[in-house]
Regions:
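Class I (Rossmann-like) S-adenosyl-L-methionine-dependent methyltransferase catalytic domain
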Residues: 2-145, 161-172, 182-260
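A conserved beta-strand element that flanks and buttresses the S-adenosyl-L-methionine
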Residues: 153
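Hydrophobic adenine-recognition pocket in adenosine-nucleotide-binding enzymes
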Residues: 157
């Protein structure tokens, strides 16, 4: 379970769009997850493999993420610490190496494919000593340690979770945050509805569906930003940053939400 990009024509996207994930899933949940695991076991443990053949966009992706994330790190209202981060769907550690380790003291990785985590130990080089945990686990089963993380980074992996499991996972992530901790989701979004990908056994949700699921998990999206300069054939990739709902007043932290 790791980061990837989907390519599909706009016409095909609309033709295969569903109104909710359950309409797209023909097989049961066990098959949905097992097919994804088998798919990733056949993917080479390289940056190009992690990005579905789009290794050339890695630097663009990382630079955009770093510019985005640094707005929320440090001291002050609405900001979080730089102690420990969690990389979800980490693969070989592409994001850990170039984004998270340069910004945080320690990082944990979680991925469903053991071969990717084994590769990460060498891919990360000397900086691997600042990785405290390599968890081999599907996110539908993963339980973050309570109050451990300043940032939980979830990129190009939520499509491998059913709606219910995504909500449950985000709730568990919420309990894994330190005070003022943040959850970042960076992923493809469909133009409309929910679009299945039979190749890697995943789905792509539109932004309104994603927002609804985040809300169900008891999180407020406090900021959104669109990743720029990706190839046109790739889905839009917004970055959303969320924090736990602390009261029922509907008030948020003061960060601007940018509609994408």
């Amino acid at each position: 379970m790791t980061d990837c990009n989907k390519r599909q024509s706009a016409r095909a996207r609309k033709q295969r769009s569903c109104t909710k994930m359950e309409d797209c899933l023909i097989e049961d949940q066990t098959t949905f997850y097992s097919k994804a695991e088998l798919y990733w076991k056949e993917v080479p443990p390289t940056v190009d493999g992690m990005l579905g053949g789009y290794g050339s966009i890695s630097s663009i992706d990382i630079n955009g993420s770093k510019k985005f994330l640094q707005k929320f790190l440090g001291e002050g209202e609405g900001k979080t610490g730089m102690g420990c981060a969690l990389d979800c769907g980490a693969g070989i550690g592409r994001i850990t190496k170039r984004l998270l380790l340069p910004l945080f003291r320690t990082v944990d990785l979680v991925d469903v494919t053991q071969e990717f985590l084994d590769k990460a130990r060498t891919y990360l080089g000397d900086e691997a000593k600042r990785v405290e945990n390599y968890f081999c686990c599907g996110l539908q089963d993963f339980q973050p340690q309570p109050e451990r993380y300043d940032v939980i980074w979830i990129q190009w992996v939520i499509g491998h979770l059913t709606d219910d499991h995504l909500v449950e996972f985000l709730r568990r992530c919420r309990s894994g945050l330190r005070p003022n901790g943040l959850i970042v989701v960076k992923d493809n979004v469909a133009y409309e509805g929910v679009i299945p990908d039979d190749v890697d056994s995943s789905v792509c949700r539109d932004l309104n569906v994603l927002r609804r699921l985040v809300d169900q998990a008891g999180l407020n999206i406090i900021y959104e930003e669109q990743q720029q300069n990706f190839p046109e054939e790739i889905y839009q990739v917004p970055v959303t940053i969320s924090k736990a709902v602390e009261n029922n007043s509907g008030e948020e932290s003061g960060w601007t939400i940018i509609e994408v």
